[in-house]
Amino acid sequence: MFSKSVTLAQYDPDLAAAIAQEDQRQQDHVELIASENYVSCAVMEAQGSQLTNKYAEGYPGKRYYGGCEYVDIVEQLAIDRVKKLFGAQYANVQPHSGSQANQAVYASVLKPGDTILGMSLAHGGHLTHGASVNISGKLYNAVTYGLDENEVLDYAEVERLALEHKPKMIVAGASAYALQIDWAKFREIADKVGAYLFVDMAHYAGLVAGGEYPNPVPFCDFVTTTTHKTLRGPRGGVILCRDNTHEKALNSSIFPSLQGGPLMHVIAAKAVAFKEALQPEFKQYAKQVKINAAAMAEELVKRGLRIVSGRTESHVFLVDLQPMKITGKAAEAALGKAHITVNKNAIPNDPEKPFVTSGIRIGSAAMTTRGFNEADARVLANLVADVLSNPEDEANLAKVREQVTALCNKYPVYGA
């Protein structure tokens, strides 16, 4: 029998120490990785609950195991809340990740060898949108579109390629594109060639939920998202549809095709996050995320850096480091020493290798969760520029680190 009085620190001090160190790192560092965020204590409580003990293959009311009457309630809460949040008629909350949600969408209506048209990874797309190293690029005939000479999504190219290749599915969405995407234009192009339209809104879902980014659900046959990133929930995925046309095919694609038992403790945490995103204060959060990102981009331009696409209309933007004569890899390392966490990222037509890159990606979701306002964002942008202007000067890095520490102490991740 397990005792509730035995703590992790008592039973496994080595693991507890590593978790404590990560907790301290999150407190002491400013998180600017666009795909990361902080979850609430309620989300963590749900994810750490005894729901992890329960197997529940199938769907609410249609399980292959007994004893599912209470986890059915949990899953139905998550389904109902996410449908309300995004105005969807169908929702599947079981995908373990965004990648698996995407796989399920493909498998529901495509056959191996069918043509898909998605955004190039090199121009800001995602691995799962047909990259050659991903299963999506191996199973399907992937054709890619990108940005025009102004680094704006090239809708004319999308239409030209669609007319030329007649894809069975067009994929929209990105992992490193700062501007708003025109879902209606994609719908128009898809209809011209009789293609399914699938949007992966993983990066923008929180902004969509908060009314600060266009909702793709009314325009699309399929929508997926992760539940972390800007949505501020546990790590996982969701599939949404505007109607129930593909319900049976999608449900079968997740179970039994791609997954077995759902992670009920994670689904519970998703339900909590969806409830949080339905609250009025989440709209203010989403608004502040955009304000902070725009403020940072403006300050970095003033300091001589170039923003890919010229500006941001979301939570994320890419910084071209070539004017500073520093690589993304070197910038990531230098900023890390100053307790500012970013990720190196390729920019369009990047001359550097993918593990080196000429850019970094910056996102404002996590810092905004901590409470950073526009003035703080501008201060932080200048600290980033201070590091990039002199990345090898240890005294400079120490000075910036001291200022970052003061900011972090002002805005603890988890208060009392």
From Swiss-Prot:
It comes from Neisseria meningitidis serogroup A / serotype 4A (strain DSM 15465 / Z2491). It is found in: Cytoplasm. It is an enzyme of class 2 (transferase). It holds the Pfam family SHMT. GO terms for molecular function: glycine hydroxymethyltransferase activity; pyridoxal phosphate binding. Homodimer. Belongs to the SHMT family. Its cofactor is pyridoxal 5'-phosphate. Its main location: cytoplasm. Keywords: Amino-acid biosynthesis, Cytoplasm, One-carbon metabolism, Pyridoxal phosphate, Transferase. This is Serine hydroxymethyltransferase. (6S)-5,6,7,8-tetrahydrofolate binds at L121, G125, H126, L127. The record marks H228 as: Plays an important role in substrate specificity. Its EC number is 2.1.2.1. The modification N6-(pyridoxal phosphate)lysine is found at K229. PANTHER family: SERINE HYDROXYMETHYLTRANSFERASE. One of its GO terms (biological process) is glycine biosynthetic process from serine. Pathway: One-carbon metabolism; tetrahydrofolate interconversion; Amino-acid biosynthesis; glycine biosynthesis; glycine from L-serine: step 1/1. One of its GO terms (cellular component) is cytosol. PROSITE patterns: SHMT. SUPFAM superfamilies: PLP-dependent transferases (SSF53383).
